[in-house]
Amino acid sequence: MKRRTAIWIGIIAALVLLGAVAQIFRICRTDLRREQAEALLEAGAYAHAREIYDGLGDTEGVARCDALQAEEVYQEGIQLLQAGDYDSARQLFSSLGSYKDTATLLAACGWQEALAFEDTGKLTEALRGFQALGQYSACQEAVEQISERLFTRAEELAAAFKLEEACAIWEELGSYESSALLLQRGRRALDWTAAPEEQRLLIPANRYLSKSLKNVYVCDQAYFVIPEECSSETRFFIYYPGGRDEEMSVDYLLYYMMNPSPNTLAVFMRKNGLDHMRENTCQAIDLLDQAAAECGVFAREIVVAGSSLGAYPAMHSVVYACEAYGIRTDCVLSLDAGSDWMEEELLLDEAECRKAARIGTEFYLFESPWVGMNREGIRMMVNTGNRVTMVGCTFDDHVRISLDAMGMGVVDWAVGDRAQPCNPEIYSFTRLEPDVG
């Protein structure tokens, strides 16, 4: 009896020991599997680690694997987006569901494709999307590319006088380049086109010498010469007379009308506003803009000229037109500048000279042969990077220099490409170079 009891006790003890050993083995095996999963996690093998955690019933470990794997896919997608592999990036972002901002990045892959199209609507939508993703360098580059393309598109629309569409783009572009200024001008032009006749400039009641001159109009501030037919190729010209804010001699207008520049809308200011140049030059551009709007055209680039003391408002207008209107002045014709460049307050200062150089305006100075780099105002313009050309005149007379320029095709040459010298039989051209050192 005792022997049988001892046998059973031994069997039970063996079973207990076996169970304990099995439990210890299971614990050790679980710990080993967990260590294996952690090692795999550290190595970036998230899928394999997830299988182990899932087998262990470790939901926290599974969640960690899912989060790390999603972040890895997310970062890989961003790298592909920045590298321009939009299809591959789209596939990765699509697999992430609602993780972080993948919905926006997924859209960005599609927006990039809009760069290949001329569709303004798609480009505008793309611009908004990339602006929302400004923290990514690839998106910042895309914003610049799309903005540049939209800006060019707006200029094309404005040239075709589709101002409502152009204004919509300028408004979207906000502070990009001169968009805000152009938006303001575009809206004013639309208002002018809708204005009643009594508020217009170019009406029959304002015709000047209608029996002898075609398409010339007058108002209190200026004379207007209007092309027979305006188009997107129409050029724009503003003239400032000499004197100290004196009434312009009509001879300059009449000489111009002997040989007017075809397809050029010209504004001849009746006074040069010497004592308030910014106000007067802005008024000149306002008049040009209104006349252009009534003709169904929009100016983005102009040529200006000034005789005698009027040369100084012409030169200053380069900066004013750019800063206040977003208009680039292609070239300035200075016709025997008055006071022999000696009145310092009339000259461009250094800051204005540098602004004019950045704009890229060319200056043609029709002067007597002894005038050049020996004038501080001219030297300053040249040494600050401006393209300045001295134009020697065979007929070196103060008044005749201007009359010849008006009547002998100089304006038409100036609003053109100026690829060849103008009237070389009476003019010589010498490009001035900056001082060495």
Over which residues does each language-model region extend?
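Glycine-rich nucleophile elbow surrounding the catalytic serine of serine-hydrolase chemistry
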Residues: 306-316
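Conserved alpha/beta-hydrolase
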Residues: 262-274
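N-terminal Sec-pathway targeting helices
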Residues: 1-17
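Short, surface-exposed "cap/lid" segments of acyl-processing enzymes
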Residues: 220, 225-259
